[in-house]
């Protein structure tokens, strides 16, 4: 039942992603639900990506094992990010034309500037 509630709260950018959100860890889903309720509507961009690599490093991304999600927040993004940074999750924000938020399993906090080709600057 919780999964159905979770999926109904969030906007998925494609039907294919509807299935992939089910693989996210409960801790990540809980953060998304909290943000959606308290800060603004959450729009999922990406969850599971087979063979995903971290830009500029070649290391395996948390997305490759469905341990991370990229999303937009409809409003109050800065307040939501401040709250997320106080939580025990990985949080990455992006600039340089990519303005989504990344949340994953882990504790890393950062901000990256990535160009349209996925290369860090």
Predicted regions and their residues:
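Residue-level recognition of alpha-helix initiation/capping sites
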Residues: 26-27, 75
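Catalytic cores and adjacent binding grooves of peptidoglycan-active enzymes
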Residues: 43, 58-121
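Extended, low-complexity, intrinsically disordered C-terminal regulatory tails
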Residues: 27-57
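Acidic/histidine-rich, surface-exposed loop or edge segments in extracytoplasmic proteins
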Residues: 18-20, 63-64
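N-terminal signal peptide c-region/cleavage motif recognized by signal peptidases
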Residues: 13-15
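Sec-dependent signal peptide recognition
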Residues: 1-7
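Catalytic phosphate/metal-binding cores of nucleic-acid and nucleotide-processing enzymes, i.e., regions
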Residues: 20-26
């Amino acid at each position: 039942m919780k999964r159905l509630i979770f999926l109904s709260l969030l906007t998925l950018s494609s039907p294919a992603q509807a299935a992939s959100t089910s693989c996210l860890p409960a801790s990540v889903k809980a953060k998304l639900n909290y943000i959606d309720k308290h800060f603004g509507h959450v729009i999922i961009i990406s969850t599971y990506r087979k063979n995903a690599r971290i830009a500029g490093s070649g290391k395996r991304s948390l997305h490759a094992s469905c341990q991370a999600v990229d999303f937009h927040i409809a409003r109050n993004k800065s307040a939501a990010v401040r709250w997320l940074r106080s939580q025990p999750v990985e949080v990455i924000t992006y600039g340089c034309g990519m303005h989504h938020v990344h949340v994953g399993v882990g504790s890393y906090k950062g901000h990256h500037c990535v160009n349209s080709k996925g290369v860090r600057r």
